[in-house]
Amino acid sequence: MAKKVILFLVEGETDEDALAVIFTRLVNNHDIKFEVLRTDITADEDMTVKYIEERIDKVIQKYLLKNPFVGDEDIIKLVQIIDTDGAFIPASLVKQSKNRKTEYFDTHIEAKNKNRLIRRNISKRNIVYSLYNRETVAGFPYEIYYFSRNMEHVLHDRAEDLTDDEKEDLAFDIADQYTDQPEKFLEYLYDDDFHVCGTYKDTWEFIMDGSHSLNRYCNVAVFFEQLEIGLEKESTK
């Protein structure tokens, strides 16, 4: 096949709607195309570090069965994007809710079921820590990036609970705004309000610290830096 493939693992339909076309446009001149696979394995309460690679491999094999003209040699990288959901905060910052709802704040979480949410956080933290320290998963080069606390929080500064319809509307807003000018989206990823500076590992150590995974942060710009697609290069075109 003419173009190499980056398999793009996202958590939901809104992520796909908002990002897939824009990312494809940004790498259009690099003989790369994105294939989007939907999976939310890091948030699966039954998932463990032991089985995470096996689960990702199943997602990839399912894709390859549906796309017989794509071979292992055509896939240059797996890229996973997750929402942090405040999962990396210390257990002491999870409080028992008094109104029987789970609510997220910049400094803590008030949980409907405190112990269950702490277990979820520990599980997700262990899985993500394992993943960002790996260079390969299922035999392919692998990278993982985050929106904190989630995509709507980063791209729209909307930290409140949103309905699925509201999330979809916001995703289409992003697609409409940046599809024809993807370099502006890349510029936005460096916004001082949420951009995390540093190396790939630096950005992960930062978000794992304290209450950062509750706050508005994003390291997706590093993905484009790894591909040598950056603001300097884009601005000289």
Predicted features by range, described:
Residues A2-K3, D17-D46, D57-K237:
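C-terminal accessory helical subdomains adjacent to catalytic cores in phosphodiester-
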Residues L7-L19:
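Catalytic nucleophile-elbow at a beta strand-turn-alpha helix junction centered on a G-D-S/GDSL motif
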